[in-house]
């Protein structure tokens, strides 16, 4: 059986710019689906009909966060608990020139209106028949989803940053997977690409971090080298702690650790962060080679003030997930794209990832890094963090083993 070959990102961009559909597939560990995607400004009633006839999924229109704000499009819910946190806003219809909003003509008009800078909030009726999606800033380098891939393709093609997408479903009602998606692309003469390749293309074309000078860093856990990095988008500073050298294709121990001031510095018993960090350093020292990327992403990305507010909610009975949601955040707000580029910058291609968190594995693999092994880094619970760890196991899918 011949290996499946996808198109290059350059080929897809050229077709997208001409107003053609592109099929975009994501990681098999994520949604494992493919979508028809087209630039919003290129949509027509005929193309909407094609999407609904041959895609059969939910017709959506990804737009930027800024465009959502301009059009005063609120999110459908304040706390998004869907599996992949699909960022639906309120649904809309264009008011002028449309009737019920459901016809192919009306849906095309509404999608094009979302990509028209002249469209104002009052021009859109709510609810409607089009589902706008709010793409995260920095696109697939922030979130490896079809929503962000759509807006990225529009930007790379020099078009207005808005698109239309729909999931591709087989005639029997099952989700189309890669072999079927390749056949769909062949049947309709379309380009097909992966989000992973789009991420790799952007990482190759763009630099999102600045690298500082390298210094020796002797610690109580071993002798390391330290390199600071500054994130270009917001000035946040991160650290790579490096031990030894390795061959290009050699898998090494890697820990991507989000900063935890309370645990890492003060030894808080409310979490296991400090103990995990120190155990990772000990394991890398024993192995003679490896990397810890220390990310400035306090409280799973919500910041110290909000993390302490979440602690207060936990004292009132909320678990760690519901506390974040109550404060208006996702359960995990971390940005794995920055950590991935730091790893690539220091020459890591393959890794034995030290984590109990399956989302971290998916997040890093989406950025073109190969994880050859998952190395658990479990810490014995104490009376102060047992409920917290149980929530991470039960609600966030962490691989943890301890008695109730």
Curated annotation (Swiss-Prot):
Superkingdom per UniProt: Bacteria
Biological process (GO), any one: riboflavin biosynthetic process
Region (DHBP synthase) residue spans: 1-204
Positions of the UniProt region annotated as GTP cyclohydrolase II: 205-404
Record keywords, A-Z: GTP-binding, Hydrolase, Lyase, Magnesium, Manganese, Metal-binding, Multifunctional enzyme, Nucleotide-binding, Riboflavin biosynthesis, Zinc
Sites where the protein binds Mg(2+) 2: 31, 146
Active site, renumbered: 332, 334
The keyword Lyase is assigned to this record: yes
Enzyme Commission identifier(s): 4.1.99.12, 3.5.4.25
Chain sites annotated for binding Mg(2+) 1: 31
Molecular functions (GO terms): 3,4-dihydroxy-2-butanone-4-phosphate synthase activity; GTP binding; GTP cyclohydrolase II activity; magnesium ion binding; manganese ion binding; zinc ion binding
Pathway: Cofactor biosynthesis; riboflavin biosynthesis; 2-hydroxy-3-oxobutyl phosphate from D-ribulose 5-phosphate: step 1/1; Cofactor biosynthesis; riboflavin biosynthesis; 5-amino-6-(D-ribitylamino)uracil from GTP: step 1/4
ATP-binding among keywords: no
Cofactor: binding comment: Binds 2 divalent metal cations per subunit. Magnesium or manganese.
Protein family according to the UniProt entry: In the N-terminal section; belongs to the DHBP synthase family.
Protein name: Riboflavin biosynthesis protein RibBA
Source species of the chain: Bacteroides fragilis (strain ATCC 25285 / DSM 2151 / CCUG 4856 / JCM 11019 / LMG 10263 / NCTC 9343 / Onslow / VPI 2553 / EN-2)
